[in-house]
Design a protein with these regions (language model features):
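Glyoxalase I/VOC metalloenzyme domain signal
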Residues: 1-5, 11-30, 46-185, 189-257
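Membrane-anchoring hydrophobic segments
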Residues: 36-38
């Protein structure tokens, strides 16, 4: 079963510039280190155990899953779920029709030299970014997640992830199979969209589809295809700040109401 959102992935052109901009927004940004596949990252950790991964490339890496998506622009591009049984949930997703790889080993070397190791099951093809990728730590999870959870802007965790989709029946089947419960129907007049919302641990994941051709989601689907669209954050104080969208590098982030 999914335990909650592990992290959201924001792909950017220049890691140092993006990390600096997120610091200007009041986030405590920690250097994550390098992956051996040509990418490096910076992390924004929250007290609920989730985090934002800001990722870029320090060398050309055309086989990387986020290399081609970055060519269409910086943005929120993918999401990872914690699971209490990686092999079982990978198998369940595959039985539901999700194109997902068997668990494979990944690693990252932190700036202090510590090598982190984990297993990932990666949704691929048209399911990338719609179905989550799944993670199981081989080294202690607390070594992977920074302990710097205090942010000047009051951010305390992920609230709701919104994923734009062209139809709902498949994701409804996936999540009901994994979670064993029905979603809540949702509608958003501003987005001119409707969808389904699943509670996953402390987080919400909503899949939204446009109901008019003028919906912002319709344009998103034309440009990027089904994929993460936006996310809200939880705040530790009553009057959360408004983010300067120019500093978010294409990621639609806001504090939930």
């Amino acid at each position: 079963m999914f335990k909650g959102i592990d992290h959201l992935v924001i792909v950017v052109d220049d890691l140092d510039r993006a990390a600096g901009d997120y610091r200007r927004l009041g986030f405590n940004v920690v250097s994550g280190g390098k992956h051996p596949v040509g990418s490096h990252n910076a992390l924004v950790a929250f007290e609920d155990g989730s985090y934002l991964e800001i990722i870029a490339f320090y060398q050309e890496s055309p086989d990387h899953r986020w290399w081609d998506p970055l060519k269409k622009g910086e943005r929120l591009v993918d999401y990872c779920m914690q699971t209490d049984d990686l092999a079982r949930d990978t198998g369940k997703l595959r039985e539901c029709g999700v194109t997902i790889n068997d668990p494979v080993p990944w690693s990252r070397i932190r700036p202090d030299g510590y090598e982190l190791e984990w297993l990932l099951s990666l949704a691929t093809g048209s399911h990338r970014g719609v179905a989550p990728f799944l993670i199981q730590d081989m080294t202690p999870r607390e070594e992977r997640i920074p302990r710097q959870w205090q942010h000047e802007n009051g951010a305390a965790g992920i609230g709701t992830l919104t994923v734009a989709v062209s139809e709902l029946s498949k994701v409804d089947h996936w999540y009901q199979t994994i979670m064993g419960k029905e979603p809540q129907p949702v509608a958003d007049d501003a987005l001119e969209a409707q969808g389904l919302c699943f509670a996953v641990g402390p987080h919400q994941v909503e899949f939204m589809t446009p109901v008019t051709p003028h919906s912002p989601l319709a344009d998103w689907l034309r440009r990027f295809g089904p994929s993460p669209y936006a996310a809200t954050l939880r705040a530790t104080r009553g009057e959360p700040v408004l983010f300067d969208q120019k500093l978010l590098h294409g990621a639609d982030l806001s504090f939930g109401i």
